[in-house]
């Protein structure tokens, strides 16, 4: 759905489905948007490097993806329920990169003027089954190679729902789920871009500009 969303804004722009090789022409694009797929990439640095190479000088990269704070409640209740019902643990929610780690990848990929920011939202659901159904409809369920292949026992999710409603309640007898979206931006290096000053080379004091006393 995200590919079609951007197609409404830029119908003539080439669109690439999530895959290891993005197939972008080197140095051919003014803008590359990596929309809500970087958290699934096996090699996120490689994805960013490909995007950087595809940009013209002073071209802009924009990225958005689910961050590490997403689904923290679901991870916790599934962990508790699995220990109680099955006596062990297995990865049931895929790990996602946090803001600091993913922001640092921009510099490694060769982008100038990198910026990383995050947006957190709380969404409520009737129960864990509606939450998991929403994830399934979005194509965001567990695809880890190390996941359990056998169908889990029904009472695992029944127990998880009980824990969820007790531990993370929301208004009107609902449950809450955190969603974090990390946003990245970076520019293809170009001589025309502003450069950071050398440390200690400032000609004016910030305290003077703000009209405050420096301690």
Predicted regions located by residue number:
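A short SAM/SAH-binding and catalytic strip from SAM-dependent methyltransferases
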Residues: 29-45, 49, 65-67
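C-terminal lobe and adjacent flexible extensions of AdoMet/dcAdoMet transferase-like proteins
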Residues: 109, 129-215
């Amino acid at each position: 759905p995200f590919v079609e969303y951007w197609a409404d804004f830029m119908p003539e722009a080439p669109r690439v489905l999530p895959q290891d090789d993005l197939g972008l022409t080197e140095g051919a694009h003014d803008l590359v948007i990596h929309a809500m797929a970087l958290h699934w990439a096996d090699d996120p640095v490689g994805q960013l490097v490909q995007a950087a190479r595809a940009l013209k000088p002073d071209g802009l990269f924009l990225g958005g993806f689910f961050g590490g704070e997403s689904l923290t409640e679901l991870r916790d209740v599934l962990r508790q329920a699995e220990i109680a019902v099955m006596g062990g643990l297995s990865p049931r929610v895929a790990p996602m990169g946090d803001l600091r780690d993913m922001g640092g990848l921009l510099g490694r990929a060769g982008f100038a003027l990198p910026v990383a920011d995050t947006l957190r939202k709380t969404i409520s659901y009737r129960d864990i089954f509606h939450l998991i159904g929403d994830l399934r409809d979005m194509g965001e369920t567990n695809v880890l190679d190390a996941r359990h292949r056998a169908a889990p026992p029904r009472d695992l999710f029944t127990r998880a729902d009980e824990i969820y409603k007790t531990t993370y309640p929301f208004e009107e007898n609902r449950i809450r789920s955190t969603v974090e979206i990390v946003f990245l931006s970076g520019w293809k290096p170009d001589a025309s871009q502003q450069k950071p000053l050398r440390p200690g080379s400032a000609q004016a004091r910030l305290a003077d500009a703000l009209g405050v006393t420096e301690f």
